[in-house]
């Protein structure tokens, strides 16, 4: 009995120890399960949920989840704070979703595309949409460094976006500033279409004085371009402007109609002709394959910078000038009833015409316009009595003349320069206009020069290149309520392509560089007694004509250095666009590469 008394407390003590151990182990396993539940809530819920069991209401699940969070908060307050922050973030995301959906529905399609590109750019790792649970796992698993990294990526994206926007703005401003900085260059896009149909078009360049007041003296001069397909005719018309036309592509037959006679001329590439104001004329393209391109310098008579064409026929593009007269005037003029005049000259406007007549008119309506197609028989009749231009000898007072009929005034292996001055041609004498035609070979340079009096309007006929024009820009500054002008030397440059126009003001030095064979047509305004002064070259160089003492006083270098520098260029008027030193370096580089290759081959073989 006494022995059992001794063993009983020992047994109780052992049982107590076992109980405490069991409790400790249970607590440890419970904490581990809680951590697992916290890390993988989706998997835990999936394991606990019986597939045969009916799904519980969403409200009940939220209550149970809230209860578990409170228990975890009691065990670990910091973890509870994180959970509350996550809940707040989740609630904010849930509130943002409807707004985003509404914005996506309201914004246009291209805006959505840009937004998707932006999202892909600053979130490159996010390849597919994620569920809310996956996002929570990603947020819970990420450390503070990953949050900093995502913020850094976002900042990087915004910086890249700002740089891209600034670059686009800079490019736009550059293009705008180019147009503003160089008012002397007009691309082919600056033409305005007056008439167009499937047979051709007539375009007019914008006014020269719209860009700068320095070209006010050109407000009464316009450039017109006429293009037509093979076997077409521009209908008869007269204009309140004098024309000087030049054929730049194809062949043409132009007919000049006067009250007492009619004269037809065959024109080819480079032929020019003056058409006086008020003269009725029409132009035929007799070629079967080649398009016709004619450029005209128009000099308005009635209104500076504006001129109008008057057609005797009515088309979809232009009304007949006969339609402007009253019925009584027309009947008295032709001594015929108005209905007959309308049928013959103006066209039938009867609204009661039948279906067949309407269909026939609709079919012919497609061919109506100021440029129409002609048959082979009609072409032969129109060209039967036509004369050709004079290639050699003295130009006629009314017939066409070719710009390259005489020898070029400047010529070498790099180019040719032809000119017809008012003194040499009676057709342009009273207009005080000269015509030039320049051929610059690929890789050649028309040396810097300037014109003493003439303002030249230059049309790029063929090829590509660039030019540099040196002018003076006035800068006005107001100091002490007095306006002062500062003169600054300015370079105006532009790329040249076919159809472009550029202006060379009098006194402005210019040089032209040809990246391919370049052909230029020039109209010189105020050309009488104009003198062309070259600034470099072995001949006609005004700098070389300066006295030695003046050279000494004018330039930083000595007169001897200036003369030696001028003599370095042995060509005149046209020269190689690449400096001789650069060519020598390129030759030495090619020679070195060849020697290196030969040494490598000799080593191998």
From Swiss-Prot:
Residues 1-30 form the signal peptide. The keyword Signal applies. Residues 184-342, 401-563 form the Cupin type-1 domain. Residues 37-193, 346-367, 382-405, 574-593 are annotated as: Disordered. Glycans are attached at residues 406, 513. It comes from the Eukaryota. One of its GO terms (molecular function) is nutrient reservoir activity. Keywords: Allergen, Glycoprotein, Seed storage protein, Signal, Storage protein. InterPro entries: Cupin_1 (IPR006045), RmlC-like_jellyroll (IPR014710), RmlC_Cupin_sf (IPR011051), Seed_Storage-Functional (IPR050253). Residues 140-149 have a biased composition (Low complexity). Residues 37-105, 150-179 have a biased composition (Basic and acidic residues). The variability of the residues taking part of IgE-binding epitopes might be responsible of the difference in cross-reactivity among legumes. Seed storage protein. Accumulates during seed development and is hydrolyzed after germination to provide a carbon and nitrogen source for the developing seedling. Component of globulins complexes which accumulate in seeds. Belongs to the 7S seed storage protein family. This is Conglutin beta 7. The gene is BETA7.
């Amino acid at each position: 009995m006494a022995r059992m008394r001794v063993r009983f407390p020992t047994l109780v003590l052992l049982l107590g120890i076992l109980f405490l151990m069991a409790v400790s182990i249970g607590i440890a396993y419970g904490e581990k399960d809680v951590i697992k539940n916290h890390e993988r809530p989706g998997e835990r819920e999936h394991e606990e949920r019986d597939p045969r069991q009916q799904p519980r209401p969403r409200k009940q699940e939220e209550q149970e989840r809230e209860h578990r969070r409170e228990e975890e908060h009691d065990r670990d307050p910091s973890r509870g704070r994180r959970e509350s922050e996550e809940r707040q973030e989740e609630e904010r995301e849930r509130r943002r979703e409807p707004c985003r959906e509404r914005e996506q529905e309201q914004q246009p399609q291209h805006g959505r595309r840009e937004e998707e590109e932006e999202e892909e750019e600053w979130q490159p790792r996010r390849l597919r949409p994620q569920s809310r649970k996956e996002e929570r796992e990603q947020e819970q698993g990420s450390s503070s460094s990953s949050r900093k990294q995502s913020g850094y990526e976002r900042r990087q994206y915004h910086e890249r976006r700002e740089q891209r926007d600034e670059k686009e703005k800079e490019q736009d401003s550059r293009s705008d500033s180019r147009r503003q900085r160089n008012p002397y260059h007009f691309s082919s896009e600056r033409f305005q279409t007056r008439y167009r149909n499937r047979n051709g078009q007539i375009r007019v360049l914008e006014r020269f004085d719209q860009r700068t007041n320095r070209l006010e003296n050109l407000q009464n001069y316009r450039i017109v371009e006429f293009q037509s397909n093979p076997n077409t005719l521009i209908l008869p018309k007269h204009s309140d402007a004098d024309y000087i036309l030049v054929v730049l592509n194809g062949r043409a037959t132009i007919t000049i109609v006067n009250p007492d006679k009619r004269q037809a001329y065959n024109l080819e590439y480079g032929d020019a002709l003056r058409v006086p104001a008020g003269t009725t004329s029409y132009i035929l393209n007799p070629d079967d394959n080649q398009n016709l391109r004619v450029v005209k310098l128009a000099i308005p008579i009635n209104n500076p910078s504006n001129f109008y064409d008057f057609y005797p026929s009515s088309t979809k593009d232009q009304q007949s000038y006969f339609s402007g007269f009253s019925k009584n005037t027309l009947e008295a003029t032709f001594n015929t009833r108005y209905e007959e005049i309308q049928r013959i000259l103006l066209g039938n406007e009867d609204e009661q015409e039948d279906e067949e007549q309407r269909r026939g008119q609709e079919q012919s309506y497609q061919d109506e316009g100021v440029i129409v197609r002609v048959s082979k028989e009609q072409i032969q009749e129109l060209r039967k009595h036509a004369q050709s231009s004079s290639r050699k000898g003295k130009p006629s007072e009314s017939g066409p003349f070719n710009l390259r009929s005489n020898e070029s005034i400047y010529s070498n292996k790099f180019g040719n320069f032809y000119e017809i001055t008012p003194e040499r041609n009676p057709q342009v004498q009273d207009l005080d206009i000269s015509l030039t035609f320049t051929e610059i070979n690929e890789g050649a340079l028309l040396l810097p020069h300037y014109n003493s009096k003439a303002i030249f309007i230059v049309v790029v006929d063929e090829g590509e290149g660039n030019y540099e024009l040196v002018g003076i820009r006035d800068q006005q500054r107001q100091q002490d309520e007095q306006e002062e002008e500062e003169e600054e030397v300015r370079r105006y440059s532009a790329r040249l392509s076919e159809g472009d126009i550029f202006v060379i003001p009098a006194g402005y030095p210019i040089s032209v560089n040809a990246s391919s064979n370049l052909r230029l047509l020039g109209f010189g305004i105020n050309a009488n007694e104009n003198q062309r002064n070259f600034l470099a070259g072995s001949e006609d160089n005004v700098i070389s004509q300066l006295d030695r003492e003046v050279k000494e006083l004018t330039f930083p270098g000595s007169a001897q250095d200036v003369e030696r520098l001028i003599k370095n260029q042995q060509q005149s008027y046209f020269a190689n666009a690449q400096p001789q030193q650069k060519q020598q370096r390129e030759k030495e580089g090619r020679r070195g590469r060849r020697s290196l290759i030969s040494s490598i081959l000799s080593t191998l073989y």
